[in-house]
Amino acid sequence: MERAVEPWGPDLHRPEEREPQRGARTGLGSENVISQPNEFEHTPQEDDLGFKEEDLAPDHEVGNASLKPEGIQNWDDLWVQREGLGKPQPRDRGPRLLGEPRWGQASSDRAAVCGECGKSFRQMSDLVKHQRTHTGEKPYKCGVCGKGFGDSSARIKHQRTHSGEKPYRARPPAQGPPKIPRSRIPAGERPTICGECGKSFRQSSDLVKHQRTHTGEKPYKCGICGKGFGDSSARIKHQRTHRGEQPPRPVVPRRQPSRAATAATQGPKAQDKPYICTDCGKRFVLSCSLLSHQRSHLGPKPFGCDVCGKEFARGSDLVKHLRVHTGEKPYLCPECGKGFADSSARVKHLRTHSGERPHACPECDRTFSLSSTLLRHRLTHMEPQDFSFPGYPLPALIPSPPPPPLGTSPPLTPRSPSHSGEPFGLPGLEPEPGGPQAGEPPPPLAGDKPHKCPECGKGFRRSSDLVKHHRVHTGEKPYLCPECGKGFADSSARVKHLRTHRGERARPPPPSTLLRPHNPPGPVPMAPRPRVRAQPSGPSQPHVCGFCGKEFPRSSDLVKHRRTHTGEKPYKCAECGKGFGDSSARIKHQRGHLVLTPFGIGDGRARPLKQEAATGLE
């Protein structure tokens, strides 16, 4: 029996660490044979001990529990006991069995904990990398563009974008074992859902970041100015403003949009948004945000609203749109408590409390709190040729004659002759080569109103205005009041109506806006006539009728009252053509044209009176 143990015993240690007499001192007899537990059964291969399982003698019984030495509770503890010492030796670098942790690896009782957020790690190196997310340290710099990274592996991945290297190739199906598919979460299932707004996320970390928009928590502080941020990436972008750094430009060349399209994007923060949309000129910080935005210009829109039928390219846009119908406003202002349906609207509102004006005009150094206000202001500095379209150069504007004196009417111009059928054109408006072909309508200019109402022929510049106007003819009111159930055709009308439930009054206009003459640039042929608004009599009823002096709390009530003086009746009945000054009066009138079918006869629907004879009802 001892002959069978001798070939295996010396192979337990490497040649330079071989101790022939060690088995006698530790109590290992000739009958004690070391064997691996059943859970470590694997294919014969060389492991950390330096031998193979197939090298064992064929007459050994592997897995006999009776052969375990005395005092050894686990087979993994065999190699750490040295000559009566019952604990591992820290400086030992000998072989280790399977399942034994490496030296220097933190165990459960020696976990490395971050002092900022309390997150724990098994190794100190992982804690050092994690702390760079709090300090913003980026010691690894790219040699091509100079971009910094907190981890060396991130820099290696980034450098492949410059070199074009693709080291990972797909393995042919014939080589290697079959690939086992991982269990992934289906695209339609998102387990993490926000309890405030109902938005779903794929990862719990994204839900934690999103919930900070509701709670206002900002754990990441700037070390220079102390400003807080809810995301570490937002703090990194903010710190570029202190260091004067600019983000790297995209490698793919992009077509520069026109000056009119990028008028509002050339402010002081334009350098932080290198990705530009070629369709509308909007800038973005991340390329993924640009790709998500371009879906709104082209591609299908699978997300449709069940209330008004409007379609969206992203589900998040549909969630925001549904708040218009439900009146939900989950984003509250911490200063005044006002609610907003969108987080960006709350950010713009907070500027009214802080007085921040981040958008500056490069022409006159005037600052604005909104980018849309800056865009309208910059149009006053631009020349007419800046509004030309590709293929349709805009000629010099013909100076208009001075207006007639007050009290006189302008002279009537004769009618133009009938159209002969030839293409109509103006000098200087011939399309350039490469422009739109013949027969295609030119794009609408700034003063055109291409969207016409088929009922009354009124024109609008935007299609959304036409949709709102068309509700006047159809009587549709998709915006319902959650308190009393009253419907409104416009969301702003519902907002004004909600003030009556809360006991609020309409705000009077500030004194600075009552008299504001318009001074256009350039020489003025005659002094403009200022428009004088009616002075409000008090803060509770600012709207006064100019005919009889009656006061109203809302401007809509004043508009309805003026129709009693002017005789205007814009709401026409589709059956008899009778006009009404109020839409509610027309609805009451139209009920007289309908007759209800008794229960059990027909389909039970309301029909016009002209169909009464056909139904056989008296």
Swiss-Prot record:
Primary gene name: ZNF48
Name of the molecule in the record: Zinc finger protein 48
Function summary: May be involved in transcriptional regulation.
Low complexity bias spans: 415-432
Biased composition (Pro residues): 392-414, 508-528
Taxon lineage: Eukaryota, Metazoa, Chordata, Craniata, Vertebrata
Subcellular location(s) of the protein: Nucleus
Gene Ontology CC, one term: nucleus
Annotated source species: Homo sapiens (Human)
Claim: Zinc is one of the keywords in the record: yes
Database matches in SUPFAM superfamilies: beta-beta-alpha zinc fingers
